[in-house]
Curated annotation (Swiss-Prot):
This is Glycine--tRNA ligase. The gene is glyQS. PROSITE patterns: AA_TRNA_LIGASE_II. HAMAP family: Gly_tRNA_synth_B. It is an enzyme of class 6 (ligase). GO terms for cellular component: cytoplasm. Catalyzes the attachment of glycine to tRNA(Gly). It is found in: Cytoplasm.
Amino acid sequence: MEDHKISMEKIVSLCKRRGFVFQSSEIYGGQNGAWDYGPLGIELKNNVSRAWWKEMTQLHDNIVGLDAAILMHPRTWEASGHVENFTDPLVDCKKCKSRFRADHLPPENLEKRVCPDCGGELTDTRKFNLMFKTHIGPTDDNSSVIYLRPETAQGIYVNYKNIIQSNRMKIPFGIAQIGKAFRNEIVTKNFIFRTCEFEQMEMQFFVKPGTDDEWFDYWKKQRWAFYEKYGVRTNKLQWHQHGKDELAHYAKDAYDIEYEFPMGFKELEGVHNRTNYDLTRHTEYSGKDMQYIDQDNGNEKYIPYIIETSAGLTRNVLMFICDAYDEEKVADKGNDDDWRTVLRFHPNIAPITVAVLPLMKKDGLAELAEEIRNELKEEFKTDYDQSGAIGKRYRRQDEVGTPFCVTVDYDSKEDNTVTLRFRDSMEQVRIPRTELISRIKTEIKNYKRAH
């Protein structure tokens, strides 16, 4: 597609039609800001999380994983500053009852207190805490208040000493976590980009003070390289450094990797130098010593600085779909049937790796195709489709991003060969059935996006 311009409407339509994402509770009219991941969506989401997890805990010897509880002691959120500071400015329209983030309104509307929807009068701005508050146990008084975690990072900080002791970790080292977080957003919008329930992929890297700038630069490079590795077009990515007015209260420096979504450049992932703020606060509030003892350097004691990489998993899913989406003219016959919709996922990200397609259902081709699929599914996520013309079946696989199709025809019965089709180029090669698995693995290893 020229300049790769797409609309969010096309993305949403494709996601629902092909089983990537559905509106939550749709039969009841839908729950605003909540989404369910369908058969292809969950495969895509799992592949993105596996790629990130491999990058962190497998390719780095000094990073380990954690799965902390969603419900944490409420003092955690007092120490982190969330109870006091995790707020957005809120205004209401007295007439139409719409709610707005004050900092997202046009300045003239906010200054004149005029609703942008109906022209009614806006209320004064007030702070709105984004944490979901609930109660634990049989009572619902202040003693039973608990929060759904608004971020996964604090679960890492409170386990930092446990992991040092149990895994004999030495600084510098990191702790990675993928998990759900919850924020009572004033406005949820742009499909799965901003929702109240979402998943984060966060890594907290503990370093000696004075080395933090060096590690900050290292992780900036690492995180940019991750998106390049999985085929994201770098002309759609940019860095945004937080100005002094944007920096969080705990941050020494912060950069966002932004992606050009249909609604413009928006944050995809943040790399933050959180200094020793979090561990210092948890020391104060818990009474526990969070200092690191450097046994290799004369038992020197210090509270580590933390370099954080924080990405939204669900936001990454949207990014990979948007970045992969393409519409391509495949013939010059002057009608709409000559266009195909294709998702150009990296093969390691694609929800289906290979589809097996018998040319016909009869004459034993379907049975042979099932045999081949059974061989392939030991190695790859596979699909099987025997309905309709072969060209339409190719198009269906293109639309969900399947990088390889294997066609089983009458020659396959005679000489034990199959046709391997490539999604991006639509080229086809004839290869022996016995070489199919090794050829697909080689193609995945050497994959380079051409569009």
